[in-house]
From Swiss-Prot:
Gene3D superfamilies in the cross-refs: Cytochrome Bc1 Complex, Chain C
Residues reported to bind a ubiquinone: 201
Further details from the record: Heme 1 (or BL or b562) is low-potential and absorbs at about 562 nm, and heme 2 (or BH or b566) is high-potential and absorbs at about 566 nm.
Organism in which the protein naturally occurs: Erignathus barbatus
Predominant localisation class: mitochondrion
Subunit structure: The cytochrome bc1 complex contains 11 subunits: 3 respiratory subunits (MT-CYB, CYC1 and UQCRFS1), 2 core proteins (UQCRC1 and UQCRC2) and 6 low-molecular weight proteins (UQCRH/QCR6, UQCRB/QCR7, UQCRQ/QCR8, UQCR10/QCR9, UQCR11/QCR10 and a cleavage product of UQCRFS1). This cytochrome bc1 complex then forms a dimer.
Binding site for heme b b562: 83, 182
Topology within the bilayer: Multi-pass membrane protein
Stored CDD domains: cytochrome_b_C (cd00290), Cytochrome_b_N (cd00284)
Highest taxon above the source species: Eukaryota
Name assigned to this protein: Cytochrome b
Location of the protein in the cell: Mitochondrion inner membrane
Transmembrane annotation, as ranges: 33-53, 77-98, 113-133, 178-198, 226-246, 288-308, 320-340, 347-367
């Protein structure tokens, strides 16, 4: 009798994706982040579902409903903080995953890469709208500032902003629709992730060497299921350390003050995982220019395959590109730090230099370094 896992219409899909999947034998821990992102997404959907049972999306009661969840609901505090800090873990895994893709040349799988970029934008939109829901000071002003950026679009900008707001300012209509979108988008992310995986399994995984591993494949289970479980345990350990010991470490104290349209906080800033993009936005004095730079800071990933001038796929044997990659990482950390600082000297200048360097590394230095490395191969 044939094994049910290979014949049953549903189970054979799971089998070909997670059990008998031929996988390169040499993929490192950097390949763990895909499964960790899946775990983060499921965790966020589950905790979010339980929060939505007690949350009210009304400007008068939103803040107090979050307080009610933390004080009165059984284990409400842990659900709320797992959701808030789960978002941070989600973005840590996301940036590691994208960084891995850049380092090892995984962007040559065009469909998988482009779906990944769409996923990144969708997750960022979801996180932004989620940050608005507690209706604290930073929620309100963050929503006001970021949605207002759309007014920089010529001709239709102002109408577009008012259409998104559902009025002439961020108010009840805005909060209600943000809650609706924040609830539905994770399921869109789930569907996109399935498509992402579908395209990945068409080609098979990349590996650290960047050369074809068709001659050396091993089954996903038990080798990588065990490895993924270890990664998951470490992820949950870090998340629970955050949740149980310093749940507000990554949050903003201003968000413990209820939203007040008449009082602007001294420093409006988004969550830490958006600070690098926020710093790029602020470093350009022109409003439309800033918005374009903000979008391009992520969209630039889409042209990574076009800028690939190297004869080798990954950076494993390319020391110049490696140095530039880690310079890019340092630059992003600098931008993250700058995004959280007030707009004053010397932070403005540092932010502008870091922003220029970010685009220069990706658009100019890396392609040139690849050409130099190609020539070194001939020596």
């Amino acid at each position: 009798m044939t094994n049910i896992r290979k014949t049953h219409p549903l189970i054979k899909i799971i089998n070909s994706s997670f059990i008998d999947l031929p996988t390169p034998s040499n993929i490192s821990a950097w390949w763990n982040f895909g499964s960790l992102l899946g775990i983060c997404l499921i965790l966020q959907i589950l905790t979010g579902l339980f929060l939505a049972m007690h949350y009210t999306s009304d400007t008068t009661t939103a803040f107090s409903s979050v307080t009610h969840i933390c004080r009165d609901v059984n284990y409400g505090w842990i659900i709320r903080y797992m959701h808030a800090n789960g978002a941070s873990m989600f973005f840590i895994c996301l940036y590691m995953h994208v960084g891995r893709g850049l380092y090892y040349g995984s962007y040559t799988f065009m469909e998988t890469w482009n779906i990944g970029i769409i996923l990144l934008f969708t997750v960022m939109a979801t996180a932004f709208m989620g940050y608005v829901l507690p209706w604290g000071q930073m929620s309100f002003w963050g929503a006001t500032v970021i949605t207002n950026l759309l007014s920089a679009i010529p001709y239709i900008g102002t109408d577009l902003v008012q259409w998104i707001w559902g009025g002439f300012s961020v108010d009840k209509a805005t909060l209600t629709r943000f809650f609706a979108f924040h609830f539905i988008l994770p399921f869109v992310v789930l569907a996109l992730a399935a498509v992402h995986l579908l395209f990945l399994h068409e080609t098979g995984s990349n590996n650290p060497s960047g050369i074809s591993s068709d001659s050396d494949k091993i089954p996903f289970h038990p080798y990588y299921t065990v490895k993924d479980i270890l990664g998951a345990l470490l992820l949950i350990l870090v998340l629970m350390l955050l949740v149980l010991f310093s749940p507000d470490l990554l949050g903003d104290p201003d968000n413990y003050t209820p939203a007040n349209p008449l009082s602007t906080p001294p420093h409006i800033k988004p969550e830490w995982y958006f600070l690098f993009a926020y710093a790029i936005l602020r470093s350009i004095p022109n409003k439309l220019g800033g918005v374009l730079a903000l979008v391009l800071s992520i969209l630039i990933l889409a042209i990574a395959p076009l800028l690939h001038t190297s004869k080798q796929r990954g950076m494993m044997f390319r020391p110049i590109s490696q140095c530039l990659f880690w310079l890019l990482v340092a630059d992003l950390l600098t931008l993250t730090w700058i995004g959280g600082q007030p707009v004053e000297h010397p932070y403005i200048t540092i932010g502008q230099l870091a922003s220029i360097l970010y685009f220069a590394i990706l658009l100019v230095f890396m392609p040139i370094a690849s050409i130099i490395e190609n020539n070194i191969l001939k020596w």
